[in-house]
Amino acid sequence: MGVAQCHAQKSGSGLRHWEIASADPDRMFLTFHGDPASGRAITWRTAGDTKTLAYAEIAKASGNSTFAREAIRIEAKTEMLDLNVSKRNKQGTVNYHSAIFKDLDPDTLYAYRVGDGGKRWSEWIQFRTASREAKPFKFVFFGDAQNGILTHWSRTIRMAYQTAPDASFALHAGDLINKSHVDNEWAEWFKAGSFLHSQWTGVPVVGNHEYIGDTKAIKKDLSIQWRPQFTLPVDEDLPEELHETVYTVAYQGMQLILLNSNKLIAEQKPYLESQLKKPGFRWRVVAFHHSVFSPRRGISETSMAIEKRWRPLFEKYNVDMVLQGHDHAYTRGQVPIRGKAEFVKNTFQTMYVTSVSGPKQYPLNPKHMKTFGPRGLETIRNGEHTQFFQVIGADGDKLNYRAYATTGELYDEATITKNFKTGKKKITQEIPDVKERVFPSKSGDKKGKK
């Protein structure tokens, strides 16, 4: 969480009731903090003129309401956020509160709530801590939400919940909104996800639209809401401007590394390698916003920087999966093992996925996708003009990947099987009998802003 100065309070005139901060907690967002087996962080919002202290309470959940008698109360940290940096915002200052849950028992169901310590509390919400063993688990993945968030992205995240209600966490690959500082867009994002943002542990990745302000904003800087509303891990070895945008989660045998592909790509390389060097993980997954293999833009300055700085480490440390967004289309491909002079045929090392979960869509560009082969990527499955979400599950020596359309239709599937002693892998394609959603008449080299 960051600190912001406050100015005169605006009235909130013209806003919908669920956009306006009040004395009641809203915009609750659960994140990892420290070891997922023993810690979490929760962040929420109240009105800027709310003067009372803020608290979180937590207890081991039970089948009846008596668990609440055993709840431990934690005083929250509070900061005021000035929304006046954008003249499109119709509220002045709001409060953001954060509390850290520590020393929890592993693989245990907990219930928590947040409030003022008096009459204004949230409902009790449950989550389960991670196991210290490599037990099977799954998580959901979302490419860009960005536009039409409440009207259209809401059905994607809700269908994901119907499909995988027991998911351990939700990974958002950037461009959660369109205009970084505009608060009504964040209001839509929180309303679209509703209780899921406080029940699923969230893993947000920063995208370029978290850096794009509106025309009246003072700066095109990181969204003023990002750090106040997401309490994320901080690595002091990283430059301060990367704090809470670059971090790592270790979950039940999986190492999940979240990077910031918007800036300081070279500066993140030492951090990335320091994390990948850590032993003891069965699976390694890396996520960031911009695509290495862009099905829309082809080779860009950003993709070249990632390919030069990060991709060699993906190969050196045998990364299993790379998850990305940005291109508003779908493609899944795979890269073989690189030999001394060339790629080794009939081998598999890393799966690359680019996806989109919101309604903004771009056509695939066959011209740019022709650059994939010489760079080592074999494209397996493509899609366009479709909203997707993914369910990814680790179980023993298998890492299963499934892509669903927002209707719930299974669109793509593959399973990686790994020998943990040798690191050698094979991939099994399990693509369902569903026609590939590619529309040649709509594809081409049309230019469009991200």
Give short role names for the model-derived ranges:
Residues 2-141, 162-163, 385, 391-450:
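Acidic, histidine-bearing metal-coordination/catalytic regions of metal-dependent phosphoesterases
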Residues 37-41, 50-55, 64-67, 148-151, ...:
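Short, solvent-exposed loop/turn elements at domain surfaces
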Residues 49, 145-148, 176-179, 208-212, ...:
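Solvent-exposed loop/turn segments at secondary-structure junctions
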Residues 51, 95-101, 109-126, 184-280, ...:
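Extended active-site neighborhood of metal-dependent phosphoesterases/phosphodiesterases
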Residues 135-205, 210-211:
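Conserved, compact domain cores that house catalytic/ligand-binding motifs in diverse enzymes
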Residues 141-143, 169-175, 201-208, 259-260, ...:
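Active-site neighborhood of phospho(di)ester-bond hydrolases with catalytic His/Asp-centered motifs
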Residues 142-148, 173-185, 214, 255-264, ...:
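The substrate-binding groove and active-site-proximal loops of carbohydrate-active enzymes
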Residues 279-322, 342, 371-373, 438-439:
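Active-site-proximal segments of metal-dependent phosphoesterases and phosphodiesterases across multiple
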